[in-house]
Amino acid sequence: MSRIGKQPIAIPSGVDVSVENNVLKFKKGNHLKELDTKGHVDVKIENGHIVFAPKGEDRQSRAYWGTYRALANNIVTGITHGFTRQLEINGVGYKAAAKGKILELSLGFSHLINYELPAGVEASVDKNVITIKGDDKQVVGQVAAQVRGFRPPEPYKGKGVKYLEERIIRKAGKTSKK
């Protein structure tokens, strides 16, 4: 039994959910998201809850059961509350600026990095903290990982771009011979 898959998802007020041909459609205001289950699981809407059930009893069906339930829950959370990731920039001369759909990064290279944000994602910069917001958990995480990948934190001084809650394991530098 999938412990995640058997939990129903409560549909919040203001969110319209419909199921057509194994495709879940979520709508709230101008947000419209779809989740195609590709026929791997049975989906029903009962008493204001989305209920998932596996198609068969094999291992693959049970895996899809929990996966699609988690994906649907992330969509509901995304269109109601949204997702955020925060990145912190450490280093002399390292800066960031949000200019519309472009995130401009100065990370010690000879050139500026102009990162174009995908649709549905917005970024804001407050001193040395970059906040990435969006309604799709996967896209927000992907953008944060790509921005961090431009200059990952190094273990000696901790310079670079890191997640705000991330802890960098520091190394001792060279010691002189006596």
Swiss-Prot record:
Superkingdom of the organism of origin: Bacteria
Molecular function terms, GO-annotated: rRNA binding; structural constituent of ribosome
Keyword Thylakoid: no
Presence of keyword Glycoprotein: no
GO cellular component, one term: cytosolic large ribosomal subunit
Keywords, comma-separated and alphabetical: Ribonucleoprotein, Ribosomal protein, RNA-binding, rRNA-binding
GO biological process entries: cytoplasmic translation
Record-linked Pfam families: Ribosomal_L6
HAMAP family per the UniProt record, alphabetical: Ribosomal_uL6_B
Family: Belongs to the universal ribosomal protein uL6 family.
Assembly description: Part of the 50S ribosomal subunit.
Function: This protein binds to the 23S rRNA, and is important in its secondary structure. It is located near the subunit interface in the base of the L7/L12 stalk, and near the tRNA binding site of the peptidyltransferase center.
Protein name: Large ribosomal subunit protein uL6
